[in-house]
Design a protein with these regions (language model features):
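Conserved alpha/beta enzyme-core scaffold
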Residues: 1-162
Length: 162
């Protein structure tokens, strides 16, 4: 099977992709410009099918709708850093805050907070079938390597990095 055939067989809508996430799982979301907003929107849109999904995120750059009070039974956010979209939920005691040095996050995800699923953005495949995490390699790469499942939002505008 060529990589092109494999790739076509693994293309899903965001709604189909989030169906792979199960209640009680730990989900790591890529950081900053790597945050897959379309996948997160689909996850929140299907919140009723989830219970106690832990979402680990650095600084949520998007709306972080999963931190809204109506989703408290569906999602539990564990933040390494707090930002504008998560700070109020943390102040209300609805978000866990795990203080950690940025440099320690890869080992934390490999050893102590091993994810079931990683949500990220990537570039389209190159001529050899390789994708790039672009501007979000930081803890995203070790999270993806440690995960049982990676759900990627392919972004035509994600630059290729080595």
């Amino acid at each position: 099977m060529t990589w092109r055939t494999w790739y076509k067989e693994h293309l899903f809508t965001p709604e189909q992709a989030v169906q792979q996430i199960k209640s009680g799982q730990r989900v790591v979301v890529a950081h900053a410009c790597g945050e897959p907003s379309i996948i997160l929107d689909a996850l929140v849109a299907h919140a009723a099918q989830y219970e106690n999904v832990e979402i680990i995120h650095m600084v949520a750059m998007g709306k972080a709708a999963y931190c809204q009070p109506q989703y408290d039974k569906n999602f539990h956010h564990n933040a390494f850093f707090l930002g504008g979209s998560t700070r109020a939920a943390a102040a209300e005691g609805r978000v866990d805050f795990t203080p950690v040095y940025f440099s320690e996050i890869p080992n934390l995800l490999r050893e102590d907070l091993r994810p079931n699923v990683t949500l990220l953005q990537c570039s389209p495949p190159d001529a050899h079938g390789y994708v790039s995490l672009g501007v979000s390699v930081d803890y995203t790469k070790p999270a993806a390597e440690a995960s049982d499942l990676v759900i990627a939002q392919v972004n035509q505008n994600m630059p290729r990095t080595l």
